Each structure stands twice: as structure tokens, then as C-alpha cells.
Amino acid sequence: MSRSETLFNNAQKHIPGGVNSPVRAFKSVGGTPLFFKHAEGAYVLDEDDKRYVDYVGSWGPMILGHSHPDVLDAVRRQLDHGLSYGAPTALEVEMADLVCSMVPSMEMVRMVSSGTEATMSAIRLARGYTGRDSIIKFEGCYHGHSDSLLVKAGSGALTFGVPNSPGVPAAFAKHTLTLPFNDIEAVRKTLGEVGKEVACIIVEPVAGNMNCVPPAPGFLEGLREACDEHGVVLIFDEVMTGFRVALGGAQAYYGVTPDLSTFGKIIGGGMPVGAFGGKREIMQQISPLGPVYQAGTLSGNPLAMAAGLTTLRLISRPGFHDELTAYTTRMLDGLQQRADAAGIPFVTTQAGGMFGLYFSGADAIVTFEDVMASDVERFKRFFHLMLDGGVYLAPSAFEAGFTSIAHGDKELEITLNAAEKAFAALK
């Protein structure tokens, strides 16, 4: 029995499902989840000392690769001064200044401890600012596990076949209007009917929780126009895309400016961090300036600020995102070529340093229906074949993949060699 199998068996005694986040249980791909003990650069090492090229990157934060020495040094320096103060620090002021300089739409920002906190707080703020109750989200878009957002939520919810979580009161869900992603006409029609009741539209500008679905041409622009017309707050959930698809996030990449944005993952450099912010007139409604309450014991934690600040400064160097995107493109092109050569229906998607893999004969992946029509069973087999070849992909057909600046020619060779064998075995 492997060390991972032993640990997983033991874990299930006191941890529900043996994991602390559902997708880690490998339920959607089968088999025993890997337990990792070390990570460095583009690699993770499991408890049985097998090394894998990592395309999960802790679900997105590790854009520099694992254990970047500058980030570790920054955390060690702060460690000597304490773990948490529950009081303001110079580091959080530096972080706020840096984020607002990188993302032009951010005039003010509030730090929190997770992406879920960020989206939950942004929606509360939008409701308080507008005096309206309803929100619009999109099928297959996941914005954390707060009650009003676990409706057709994609990602882990899709993985486990429970798109609407039990435990969410109907009274909460009734204020959440769910529309098809990339369907701007559905948005216009809905706002035309109930626009005066809608506080905000929240959207992943790249839907990273039904694998990776970029916006259709004109979709984000249409959302901006529709929100302006009906006095609705536009929220971009950039927990995945922020600082990854471009330094200024998806809003810079696609040239569409939201009213509020939420961030997580990269902003913490691997530590638990989230943030939300945007227009000053809206953010001034947050306590202690305004009546909309939000608070957090560990918000702005100094260790997390040290890791996040260092990460953001390192990814600010000229050419960083071009290099990240170029590697991702080379990797996806190589996968597509090998799938085509093997006669396997296969489609890839990309937004900067994030990507999607679909076993599908579709010309493109644009809608939730396109995603659901992909061959999930074939993905399961592919996942395990790649794992055998030393490549760790997200253990779900509905999760995006991530590259890091630490991925290079050697990792590309390992990945494509494993893929060539995997596609051949899938014939």
C-alpha cells in the first residue's frame, strides 16, 4: 500500500471524505488522492517520493512556481516579528497602494482572508450601495461557497453532481438569478424585465470553474453597457484571473472596466488572502466609513502580506506575462498536435497562463452546454495516464489548469512525452 493510500485511509476517520476541500478527494477521476510533502519550482513531490510536473499550482496562486526563494525569505523575515497583530500594519498599506497601481479600476481595496470572503463582501456592498436585493450570476461560474452563490455553481459542485448545494435556504437562492454564460441577450432581456431589482452582476471574466471558458467577443463589453443602462454594479470575480492573464487582470486583458473586483490566490503568494475593491464612491460605503459591515480577524495578516507583496513585485517585471503565456501556448499546441495525430477529439482553451482541456469534437468551447457535452470518462483515463507519466493535472474535467514561470523546456518535454503515450492509449 502506498503512503498516500495509508494517509487517506487514516484521514477519513476524522476528516469528512478524508480531505479539506472536496475536489482533492479524486472522486471525479477515481483512485486515491495524492498526498504531497514538498513542492519546488514546477514540481510537486508526493509522500512516496514520486515527482510530478505540476499544472495545478495550488489551484492558481503559484505563478512563480513553488517555494520561490524571494517569497520564502520575505515570509521568514516577517516571521521574526510575529504571526498576527489584529491591528493595522505598514505592509497592508503597501499592498493597497501596489494593487491600486496595478489595476486601474481599483481606487480603494479591502483585504480579507479568502476569495469566498471577497465575493461575499463585494455582493453585500453592491446590495448596500444600490438598495436592491437580487443578483445575477452565470451557469458554471463559481464564486465561493457563500449561500447565495451556490446556485449552478460549476467547479467542485459540478464535479460532485450537486449543482445546487443542500443547506442553502430557498429564501436566499430566490434572490440569485442564473443566466447562461456568454449569452448577452439573456442579460439584456432579464434586466429589461427586473433591472430595478438587481444590485449587481457578478461574473468570472474567464469562467475558470467549468474548466476554462474565455468570454465570447462582445460579452464583457455588453455586460458593462447593460449595467450602466440599469444602474447595476458590475463585479468581476478575478480570484483566478487576477494578476495571471495580465498584470492588471482580465479587465486589463480584455479592456473592460468593472465597478468592483475580487481577488485571491496570486495576491497572497500562496498564503490565505483575498481582496475586493473598486470605485471609491462604492467602497466608501464599507464600515467604518459607511453602513455596510465587513470585518475579519486575520484580514491583512502580515505573513500573507509579505508573501503577496513579494509575488506581485516579481511578476511586475517587463515580459513576465508574455513568457508565461508563450509557454502555455506551446504546451497546448503540443497537446493538440498529439491528440490530432492519435485521432482523439480534443479542444484546448487559454487565457494567458490558465488553460482548459476538453475531450470534445466541438469547434470551440463557448457555453456551459459545450462543457457538459465533453467526454468526462475519457478525461478520467487521460488524467491517470498523465499521472503515470509524471504530470499532475487538476483531478476534475471541470477545473482550469495553471502554468508558472518555472515551467520551461524540460517540463514541456516531460508533459508532451506523457501526453503522446496517453493519447495513444486512449485510441
Curated annotation (Swiss-Prot):
Q: Which EC number applies?
A: 5.4.3.8
Q: Which residues carry this modification: N6-(pyridoxal phosphate)lysine?
A: 265
Query: What CDD domains does the record point to?
Result: OAT_like
Q: Which UniProt keywords are given for this protein, alphabetically ordered?
A: Cytoplasm, Isomerase, Porphyrin biosynthesis, Pyridoxal phosphate
Q: Spell out the subcellular localization from the entry.
A: Cytoplasm
Q: In which pathway does it act?
A: Porphyrin-containing compound metabolism; protoporphyrin-IX biosynthesis; 5-aminolevulinate from L-glutamyl-tRNA(Glu): step 2/2
Q: Quick one: a GO biological-process term for this protein?
A: protoporphyrinogen IX biosynthetic process
Which cofactors go with this protein? pyridoxal 5'-phosphate
Q: Where is the signal peptide?
A: none
Cellular component GO terms, alphabetical: cytoplasm
User: Pfam families attached here?
Assistant: Aminotran_3
Keyword Cytoplasm included in the entry's annotation: yes
According to its UniProt record, this protein's enzyme class is isomerase
One GO molecular-function annotation for this sequence? transaminase activity
Q: Which reaction does it catalyse?
A: (S)-4-amino-5-oxopentanoate = 5-aminolevulinate
> What quaternary arrangement does the UniProt entry report?
Homodimer.
Membership in a protein family? Belongs to the class-III pyridoxal-phosphate-dependent aminotransferase family. HemL subfamily.
PANTHER family, alphabetized: GLUTAMATE-1-SEMIALDEHYDE 2,1-AMINOMUTASE, GLUTAMATE-1-SEMIALDEHYDE 2,1-AMINOMUTASE 1, CHLOROPLASTIC-RELATED
Protein name, as recorded: Glutamate-1-semialdehyde 2,1-aminomutase
